[in-house]
């Protein structure tokens, strides 16, 4: 029983755009609560080994996936296939909360950043 409890411990990571909290984590499934601060956005990024599913649980945000941008409000959802460039954008004056489900090979270093407001993007080749 102890290994399951360890996987379910809440872990908070502060980011320049807000924070995320690990709610559940295994090698193949991750459940996160993401809070995007007002007027902030995540990097434009892609993952080679995992897909993601987002549910807006509070506020609203823009979701950019490839060339498309959608406004999602509370309980709005979107699925991001592995390999697709994507990002969350909070263009409002209130925080936006997202529940993120990751599935596949879930590792934090499985990320390619194409654009980033905080100078974390990969240099062009």
Could you tell me what each predicted segment is?
Residues 3-15, 87-125:
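Double-stranded beta-helix
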Residues 43-45, 54, 63-64, 80, ...:
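Short beta-strand His + acidic residue motifs that chelate non-heme Fe in jelly-roll/DSBH
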Residues 29, 49-62, 66:
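Glycine- and acidic-residue-biased ligand/ion/polar-headgroup-sensing regions
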Residues 9-51:
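A short glycine-rich, His/Asp/Glu-containing loop-to-beta-strand
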Residues 67-85:
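Short acidic-glycine-tyrosine-enriched beta hairpin
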Residues 1-3, 17, 36-38, 77-79:
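Extended recognition/assembly regions associated with phosphoester-bond processing machinery
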Residues 40, 49-50, 68, 84-85, ...:
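A generic "binding-loop/recognition-motif" signal
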């Amino acid at each position: 029983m102890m290994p399951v409890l360890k996987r379910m411990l809440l872990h908070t990571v502060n980011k320049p755009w807000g924070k995320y909290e690990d709610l559940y984590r295994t090698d193949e499934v991750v459940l996160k609560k993401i809070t995007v601060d007002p007027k902030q956005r995540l990097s434009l990024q892609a993952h080679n080994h995992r897909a993601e599913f987002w549910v807006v649980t509070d506020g609203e945000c823009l979701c950019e996936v490839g060339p498309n941008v959608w406004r999602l409000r509370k309980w709005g959802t979107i699925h991001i296939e592995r390999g697709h460039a994507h990002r969350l954008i909070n263009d409002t004056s209130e925080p936006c909360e997202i529940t993120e489900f990751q599935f596949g090979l879930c590792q934090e270093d499985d990320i390619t950043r194409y654009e980033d407001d905080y100078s974390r993007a990969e240099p062009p080749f």
